[in-house]
């Protein structure tokens, strides 16, 4: 009986492959690489919270939160990281609010960035579809879902009601896009705004725009909220942002982290690197002094951050050590790798340079 079932299954598989092509169905054990490839978010803390070292390729990501919480900043850091690895990024600016100077300050090469400012939601999603289907774009960002206004609403009069029009538009678009996104291994990031549901007495009244479709199709949903101000004396120089991974299909969800978003600079990479290096015993903190290896790098957190910024080679080396210590692939072509013996013997600060393989990019 078991042999008959197996023979029937083999016949069915051959028939499917004949009708739809080789690889249309397979046993998961036959897959050459089942590991989900990822691209760094540009933030060590967020990469760790995501669980796989960055945003997964071929998947949909939703970033949402209140106004001025840092959603666009986080998305632009992803653009800079994709470009740093030699990839191509596209930005669909439905809000018409992208600041090129700020993007450049975050490390984005604006000369190579593909930018579209569509006149309607249909146009923006058609442009996204064309870019994704080309297979030549690594990252597409839609900023934002709330600004993808259906053409019927634009052509209508003020005050006209268009119930569920945007939700139907998003549902149709995502049905079409999800397959192409997976096939071309493109990362699609949708930035979204929050609204409040009327008449909710119990529970959270907040919801995101564009209906439920994006919630279902997203592999990762990331909530960003402003926590507190960062001050230098009396001057406000940035904000602390709390990031929560609300949904994650490729790693355990509900991880949280905090990032410093500095005005005109974006996410403070030196700050989060220093904090995580201390957590992993790669940087020694004794009182107010920070030491890396045999060298004292600064008294107080701000001075230690300044030292890292002034020594990019040491910063890149330390960043790769932190990534490896947290189970992530190193980013830089050359890095110091700490072996288990080194860690056990406390030699975490020695400068042993060794070449590592560049993170694979599918």
Swiss-Prot record:
Database matches in InterPro entries: AAA+_ATPase (IPR003593), DNA_recomb/repair_RecA (IPR013765), DNA_recomb/repair_RecA_CS (IPR020584), P-loop_NTPase (IPR027417), RecA-like_C (IPR049261), RecA-like_N (IPR049428), RecA_ATP-bd (IPR020588), RecA_C_sf (IPR023400)
Tagged with keyword DNA-binding: yes
Source organism, top-level taxon: Bacteria
Region of interest (Disordered), residue spans: 323-362
Binding site for ATP: 65-72
Principal location: cytoplasm
Coiled-coil positions: none
Subcellular location: Cytoplasm
GO cellular component: cytosol
Sorted UniProt keywords: ATP-binding, Cytoplasm, DNA damage, DNA recombination, DNA repair, DNA-binding, Nucleotide-binding, SOS response
Classification via Pfam families: RecA, RecA_C
GO function terms (MF aspect): ATP binding; ATP hydrolysis activity; ATP-dependent DNA damage sensor activity; damaged DNA binding; single-stranded DNA binding
Biased composition (Basic and acidic residues): 331-362
GO terms under biological process: DNA recombination; DNA repair; SOS response
Role, per record: Can catalyze the hydrolysis of ATP in the presence of single-stranded DNA, the ATP-dependent uptake of single-stranded DNA by duplex DNA, and the ATP-dependent hybridization of homologous single-stranded DNAs. It interacts with LexA causing its activation and leading to its autocatalytic cleavage.
PANTHER family named in the record: MITOCHONDRIAL DNA REPAIR PROTEIN RECA HOMOLOG-RELATED, RECA
NCBIfam families in the cross-refs: tigrfam_recA (TIGR02012)
Family: Belongs to the RecA family.
Protein name (database record): Protein RecA
Organism whose genome encodes this protein: Limosilactobacillus reuteri (strain DSM 20016)
């Amino acid at each position: 009986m078991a042999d008959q079932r197996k023979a029937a299954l083999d016949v069915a598989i051959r028939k499917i492959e004949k009708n739809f092509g080789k690889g249309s169905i397979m046993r998961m054990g036959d897959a050459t690489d089942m590991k989900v490839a990822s691209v760094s978010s540009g933030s060590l803390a967020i990469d760790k919270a995501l669980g796989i070292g960055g945003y997964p390729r071929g998947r949909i990501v939703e970033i949402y939160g209140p106004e001025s919480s840092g959603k666009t900043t986080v998305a632009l850091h992803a653009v800079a990281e994709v470009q740093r690895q030699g990839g191509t990024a596209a930005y669909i600016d439905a809000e018409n609010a992208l600041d090129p100077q700020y993007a450049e300050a975050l490390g984005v090469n604006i000369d190579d960035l593909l930018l579209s400012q569509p006149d309607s939601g249909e146009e923006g999603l058609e442009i996204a579809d064309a870019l994704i289907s080309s297979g030549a774009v690594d990252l597409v960002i839609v900023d934002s879902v709330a600004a993808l206004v259906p053409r019927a609403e634009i052509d209508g009069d003020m005050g006209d009601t268009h119930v569920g029009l945007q939700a139907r538009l998003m549902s149709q678009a995502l049905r079409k896009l999800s397959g192409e996104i997976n096939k071309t291994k493109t990362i699609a990031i949708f930035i979204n705004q929050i609204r409040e549901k009327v008449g909710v007495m119990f529970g959270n009244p907040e919801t995101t725009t564009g209906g439920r479709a994006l919630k279902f199709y997203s592999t990762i949903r990331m909530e960003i909220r402003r926590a507190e101000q960062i001050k230098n004396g009396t001057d406000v120089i940035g904000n602390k942002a709390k990031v929560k991974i609300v949904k994650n299909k490729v790693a355990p969800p509900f991880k949280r982290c905090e990032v410093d978003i500095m005005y005109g600079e974006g996410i403070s990479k030196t700050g989060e690197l220093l904090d995580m290096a201390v957590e992993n015993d790669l940087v020694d903190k004794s009182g107010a002094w920070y030491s890396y290896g045999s060298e004292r790098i600064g008294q107080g957190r701000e001075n230690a951050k300044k030292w890292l910024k002034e020594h990019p080679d040491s910063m890149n080396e330390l960043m790769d050590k932190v990534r490896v210590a947290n189970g992530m692939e190193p980013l830089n072509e050359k890095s110091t790798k700490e072996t288990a013996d080194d860690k056990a013997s406390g030699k975490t600060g020695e400068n042993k340079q060794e070449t590592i393989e560049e993170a694979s990019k599918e």
